[in-house]
């Protein structure tokens, strides 16, 4: 059988009686994304050691309606979470009588580019810290407030608001920070480890089958640069660790806890795979 680069015969995976069909390839669109007059980098030269020559935003793999919705801030439902996050930013909570703004003033200035640099190394906890965990650390240590429960409305909204201040900024983590490189290695191992009853790894869909269709979903590289993301199929915002857990659930494997060592290592590695792509939060996906 002759196999071309673009058109491949359907591939079937059968595990435990479940058949998954990976159908013919379809190239990502050749379009430019501009949000609020800010050009987004949706194609970026991959860093050394990356499996692809080019990092590709998931926006390039979505249907026209989804792409158009993200490009229009007035139409993007995820902007409601950003607006809610702005309210929380200025709301006093906790025994210290402080809000986020009490220490950080105008987020447009103090949080500019911050979302493109996380995860970072937390020397106190001796592990990586992401935006959500940094919010909780500030709430507990500086505000005297309770940490958010995972995926609480306030946590997702405030994370969206903070990351939105980096809209258009290319993702760039510093792997020389603390022990991040070691966690990158752990995350890479997890990314390629097959698990669950379906015996799938992250790489099974987002590397080996990137560009193919599984059911009606055009498989992308699984980039993290748009999270938290508004998803049409859930009708709401989805955090990165929610998405990780959802993918793991779909392989019929036991789900790790959010912000566990496993998922923090995975976040470090997956974020690195999107080096150079613009922060799109809140991205819109199907």
From Swiss-Prot:
Residue positions binding substrate: 243
SUPFAM superfamilies: Cytochrome c (SSF46626)
Reactions it catalyzes: L-cysteinyl-[SoxY protein] + thiosulfate + 2 Fe(III)-[cytochrome c] = S-sulfosulfanyl-L-cysteinyl-[SoxY protein] + 2 Fe(II)-[cytochrome c] + 2 H(+); S-sulfanyl-L-cysteinyl-[SoxY protein] + thiosulfate + 2 Fe(III)-[cytochrome c] = S-(2-sulfodisulfanyl)-L-cysteinyl-[SoxY protein] + 2 Fe(II)-[cytochrome c] + 2 H(+)
GO molecular function: electron transfer activity; heme binding; metal ion binding; oxidoreductase activity; oxidoreductase activity, acting on a sulfur group of donors, cytochrome as acceptor; transferase activity
Major site of localization recorded for this protein: periplasm
Post-translational modification: Cysteine persulfide at Cys-247.
Keyword terms of this UniProt record: Electron transport, Heme, Iron, Metal-binding, Periplasm, Signal, Transferase, Transport
Cofactor(s), by name: heme
Active site: residue positions: 247 (cysteine persulfide intermediate)
Gene3D superfamilies (alphabetical): Cytochrome c-like domain
Endpoints of the signal sequence: 1-26
Any single biological process term in GO: sulfur oxidation
Gene inactivation effect: Impaired in oxidation of sulfur compounds.
Principal EC category: transferase
Localization (cell): Periplasm
Protein function: C-type diheme cytochrome, which is part of the SoxAX cytochrome complex involved in sulfur oxidation. The SoxAX complex catalyzes the formation of a heterodisulfide bond between the conserved cysteine residue on a sulfur carrier SoxYZ complex subunit SoxY and thiosulfate or other inorganic sulfur substrates. This leads to the liberation of two electrons, which may be transferred from the SoxAX complex to another cytochrome c that then channels them into the respiratory electron transport chain. Some electrons may be used for reductive CO(2) fixation.
Family statement: Belongs to the SoxA family.
Name of protein: L-cysteine S-thiosulfotransferase subunit SoxA
Organism in which the protein naturally occurs: Pseudaminobacter salicylatoxidans
Gene: soxA
